[in-house]
Amino acid sequence: MAHPHASATLAAAMNRFAQQLAAHHLTLQRSALVTLQINLGRRCNQACRHCHVDAAPWRTEMMAADTARRIADWIQRHRPSVVDLTGGAPELNEHFRFLVETARSAGARVIDRCNLTILTEDGFDWLADFLAVNEVEIIASLPCYLEENVRQQRGDGVFAKSIAALRQLNALGYGTRLPLHLVYNPLGPTLPPPQAELEADYKEALARDHGVLFTRLFTITNQPIARFAENLRHQNRWDEYLDLLAAGFNPATVERLMCRNTLSVGWRGELFDCDFNQMLGLQLRNGHPLHLWDVTPADLADRGIQTGAHCLACTAGCGSSCTGAVTDQPLRPLFGEAISVNP
């Protein structure tokens, strides 16, 4: 017979996200693989204060040629539907073009997670044309349509460079013929506003003030890891933010979480359930740490997903993923007076 306090003891041992799943009688496991998300390294030409990767110009962790070749071989053999290239600034890796061309030749839809300012850096005048010729989908970070808010999060001069880059992409057909999506992160420890409403505001402001067009806006909740976690602790707001995320847990998001159909690959080829788990070192294992070339898509189906309290960021409100909100059915209280959002 089970000890009367067994359930309470088990709940205490669970992370806060696992407790929410258990309370709602939900499980989280992988479905069929759709997206192979590849982190090409931690180097970036920026050092944004919200960055969950801790990326910066001084980082040296970058994917080597042998790793890129082994990943390219896997892509050609298993042909994932989507290949999503991220960093750091993925374009800084010398094997970026090789991986784009390999994935496109394998029939994959290719995504470049671009910080926009890389397009204005010396030595990257080839980049915009290369992306357009290969019909690469661009998901670009622009945390606000107001210059001051961008300056606070990303630094001086970043907004002007981002607008210049967007105009360059528009001239090549991005935002009309080719997909150009923007990403919004709240400035502080709040949840994003409803995605559709904010997208309308972005489109109006960028077109009116800068003549810039884009396809869609993705809202992403800040993950309580890396630099953002450091800021929360410095402000003594860690517990407050975790409580906000837990209070906003939305069961409707779980089925659509990106970790169910996305596989995250580190710059050394290591495997993770998502990019956030990658930054926390939660590597997939099968008695030993797994690398991409150790598995097939079929090996991963129905596998359980490693979780932590940070996963609450993906299930609060309308949910959050690398392609924005995961449901249009938020919990009502999140957009009322009790919990503020950052427009």
Regions of interest found by a model, annotated:
Residues 1, 139, 147-259:
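Radical SAM enzyme [4Fe-4S]-AdoMet core and its adjacent flexible, acidic
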Residues 4-87, 91-102:
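Conserved alpha-helical substructure of the radical SAM core
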Residues 35, 55-64, 78-93, 104-123, ...:
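Core AdoMet radical
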Residues 36, 72, 100, 128, ...:
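Generic structural signal for well-ordered alpha-helices
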Residues 47, 79, 134-135, 176-179, ...:
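Short loop/turn motifs at secondary-structure junctions
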Residues 97-99, 122-128, 193:
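Distinct, well-ordered alpha-helical segments
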Residues 246-280:
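C-terminal accessory regions of radical SAM enzymes
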Residues 270-343:
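Flexible mid-to-C-terminal extensions adjoining Fe-S/redox cofactors in radical SAM and related proteins
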